[in-house]
């Protein structure tokens, strides 16, 4: 399984996946290829990928720099056990609180984040209110985490304690606390999260918290991980 950090619609950041032997990519938000409706740049990559790589698939958990109004109009499909929005026949956005069961991995997905630059953006044009992780998203994700088996969490943003350890408080924008609540509610009620990975912060950082390994991926950073691989070997920064 090919895990990929933020892309921001920069198609060159997808090349390694296209040239790899991996069939599936899980992209960790700020995918960015659905931003301006029918924009030629974004559609060019998506159409090229659909036509020329029919045996590969991209899944994204979505971030904050996405056009949620357009994405919410896309058809809903069940893919590998998860409710997804169909962007192309081989490109899907995984909805929040869904478990994607693929390549032997059960991945609990929770996209979304708050934009720190939204004051300079325009609602419905370059910023969308749906980016924020809602209380309903938190409840659904916790319920899935406590009732279903999973191997890891994939998010866009990272929990508040991760941010406070590694960044100044000005980067606390809201959704980090929702993610912290998800972590605590699962861990304090009999569940366990061995691995949590995300993007958003544009830095490669690893951190152990209790018995969970947290790992943020930089822009365009990749990690290839399979079911029987060592978490520490693959996700710790050596």
Which residues are covered by each model-predicted region?
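Well-ordered, non-membrane alpha-helical segments in soluble/globular domains
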Residues: 39-47, 135-141, 173-181
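Core catalytic region of metal-dependent phosphoesterases/phosphodiesterases
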Residues: 4, 9-102, 172-173, 217
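Active-site environment of divalent metal-dependent phosphoester hydrolases
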Residues: 8-14, 32-36, 62-72, 99-100, ...
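Beta-strand-turn-beta hairpins that frame and shape the catalytic cleft
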Residues: 1-2, 98-109, 152, 208-214
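Conserved beta-sheet core of the metallophosphoesterase superfamily
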Residues: 57-61, 85-89, 161-236
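Structural motif
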Residues: 3, 25-28, 152-156, 197
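Active-site-proximal loop/helix segment associated with metal-binding centers of metalloenzymes
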Residues: 103-174
């Amino acid at each position: 399984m090919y895990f990929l950090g933020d892309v921001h619609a920069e198609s060159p950041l997808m090349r390694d996946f296209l040239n790899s032997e991996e069939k599936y990519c899980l992209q960790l938000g700020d995918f960015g290829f659905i931003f301006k409706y029918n924009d030629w740049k974004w559609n060019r990559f998506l159409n090229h990928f659909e036509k020329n790589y029919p045996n590969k698939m991209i899944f994204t958990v979505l971030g904050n720099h996405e056009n949620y109004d357009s994405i919410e109009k896309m058809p809903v499909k069940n893919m590998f056990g998860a409710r997804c929005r169909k962007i192309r026949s081989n490109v899907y956005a995984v909805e929040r609180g869904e478990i994607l069961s693929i390549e032997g991995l059960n991945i609990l997905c929770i996209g979304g984040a708050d934009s720190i630059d939204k004051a300079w953006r325009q609602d419905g044009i370059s910023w969308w209110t749906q980016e924020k992780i809602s209380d309903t998203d938190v409840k659904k994700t916790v319920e899935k985490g406590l009732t279903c088996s999973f191997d890891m969490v994939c998010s866009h943003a990272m929990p508040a304690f991760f941010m406070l350890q590694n960044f100044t408080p000005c980067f606390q924008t809201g959704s980090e606390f929702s993610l912290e609540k998800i972590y605590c509610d699962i861990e304090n009620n009999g569940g366990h999260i061995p691995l949590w990975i995300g993007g958003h912060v544009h830095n490669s950082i690893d951190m152990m918290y209790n018995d969970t390994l947290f790992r943020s991926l930089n822009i365009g950073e990749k990690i290839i991980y399979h079911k029987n691989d060592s978490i520490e070997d693959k996700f710790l920064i050596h």
